[in-house]
C-alpha cells in the first residue's frame, strides 16, 4: 500500500515537472501575452465583429443598399416607422411656416396634403419601414449602405494587403537570401519606387484605367509592398546564417525550400504585425480617393464615398457624415489596437512589459 502511494506521488511529480518544462511555441507565447492586453483584445473582438458583418451582410435583415424611394429622402435616424417620421417632419415644417405668416390654422391646401399623406401612410407598406440610421438624398437606407460600404472598404484593405504581402515578402526574401547583385538591384528598385509620389501614381492609374474596384486595390497594392520588402529582407539577412539554415543546406535543401520552408516561417510574426498595421492605411487611401471622386462607382459604396457624400450636406443632414465616419474610425482604431498588441506579443523584448 505504501509502495503504491509513493509510486502515485512520484508519477504526479513527474507529470507536474513535465508540465513546467513543456516547451512553449512562439504562437502559444504570443497568444498568452495578447490575452493580457485588454486594448488588443477589444481590437480583436471589434475587428472580428466587423468582418462577420461584412461576410454575412446579404443575410442581415436590412434593406437593399441600392434601393431608392424618393418619398423618403433625408429622413433622420429614428425608431419610428418612416410614415410617422415623414408626417412629423411635414407638421414641423408647416408649424414654422404658420409662425412666419402669423396664422393659427391650416389652409385648405395644407389640410388636403395632410389627409392625402395620412391615407398614403395607411395604404403604402413602404411607409412602415424603419430607418434606424436615416436615409440619404435618394431615400436609401444609411444603415444598409454603411454595412455594405464597410464590406467594400474592408475587402479593398484585405485584398490590397494580401497583394502587397505577396509581392513584398517574395522580393524581400529573395533579395535577402541571394545577396550580391540581386540584392543590390532589387533594393535600388525599391529606393527608386520610394522616391516616386505614391498617391499621385495611384490617382493617375485610376484616372487612366477607370473607376473599378479591382483596379482600385491593385493600384494601391502595387505601390504599397515596398516597406514589407525591406523588413523581410532584413529579417532574412539576420537568419540566413543560422544553424538551422546551415543544417538544411548540408542536407541538400534547395534555396527555394530554405527560403519558404525554413526562413519565412520565422518571419511570420513581423508579417502578421505589418498586415494589421497596413490594412488601415489601405482603407484610408481608398477613402481619400473616394473623397476625390476616384473611388468605387455607384451604386456601390464604401466608407470613403459615404463620407464624401455626407460632407456635401453636413450642416443640414449631419447623420450622413457622422455615421460612416464613426463606423470607419472605430474599425481603424480597432485595427491599430490589435496591431500594437500583436507587435508587443511577438516582440521578445516586451515580455516584461505585459
Annotated model-derived regions:
Residues 1-165, 169, 313-323, 327-334, ...:
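Gly/Trp-centered helix-boundary motif
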Residues 135-354:
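Alpha-helical transmembrane segments of integral membrane proteins
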Amino acid at each position: 500500500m505504501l509502495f503504491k502511494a509513493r509510486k502515485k506521488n512520484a508519477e504526479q511529480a513527474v507529470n507536474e515537472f513535465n508540465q513546467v518544462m513543456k516547451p512553449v511555441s512562439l504562437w502559444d507565447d504570443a497568444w498568452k501575452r495578447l490575452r493580457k492586453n485588454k486594448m488588443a483584445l477589444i481590437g480583436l473582438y471589434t475587428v472580428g465583429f466587423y468582418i462577420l458583418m461584412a461576410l454575412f451582410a446579404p443575410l442581415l435583415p436590412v434593406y437593399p443598399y441600392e434601393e431608392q424611394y424618393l418619398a423618403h429622402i433625408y429622413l433622420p435616424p429614428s425608431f419610428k416607422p418612416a410614415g410617422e417620421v415623414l408626417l412629423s417632419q411635414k407638421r414641423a415644417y408647416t408649424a414654422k411656416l404658420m409662425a412666419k405668416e402669423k396664422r393659427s390654422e391650416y389652409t385648405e391646401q395644407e389640410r388636403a396634403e395632410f389627409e392625402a399623406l395620412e391615407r398614403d401612410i395607411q395604404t403604402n407598406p413602404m411607409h412602415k419601414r424603419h430607418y434606424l440610421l436615416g436615409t440619404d438624398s435618394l431615400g436609401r437606407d444609411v444603415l444598409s449602405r454603411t454595412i455594405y460600404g464597410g464590406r467594400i472598404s474592408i475587402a479593398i484593405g484585405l485584398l490590397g494587403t494580401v497583394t502587397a504581402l505577396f509581392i513584398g515578402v517574395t522580393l524581400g526574401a529573395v533579395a535577402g537570401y541571394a545577396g550580391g547583385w540581386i540584392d543590390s538591384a532589387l533594393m535600388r528598385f525599391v529606393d527608386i519606387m520610394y522616391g516616386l509620389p505614391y498617391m499621385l501614381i495611384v490617382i493617375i492609374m485610376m484616372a487612366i484605367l477607370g473607376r473599378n474596384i479591382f483596379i482600385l486595390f491593385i493600384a494601391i497594392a502595387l505601390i504599397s509592398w515596398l516597406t514589407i520588402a525591406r523588413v523581410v529582407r532584413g529579417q532574412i539577412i539576420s537568419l540566413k546564417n543560422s544553424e538551422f539554415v546551415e543544417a538544411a543546406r548540408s542536407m541538400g535543401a534547395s534555396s527555394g525550400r530554405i527560403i519558404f520552408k525554413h526562413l519565412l516561417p520565422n518571419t511570420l510574426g513581423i508579417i502578421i504585425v505589418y498586415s494589421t498595421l497596413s490594412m488601415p492605411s489601405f482603407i484610408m487611401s481608398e477613402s481619400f480617393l473616394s473623397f476625390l471622386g476616384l473611388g468605387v462607382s455607384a451604386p456601390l459604396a464604401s466608407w470613403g464615398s459615404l463620407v464624401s457624400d455626407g460632407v456635401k450636406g453636413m450642416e443640414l443632414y449631419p447623420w450622413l457624415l457622422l455615421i460612416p465616419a464613426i463606423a470607419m474610425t472605430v474599425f481603424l482604431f480597432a485595427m491599430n489596437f490589435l496591431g500594437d498588441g500583436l507587435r508587443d506579443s511577438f516582440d521578445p523584448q516586451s515580455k516584461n512589459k505585459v
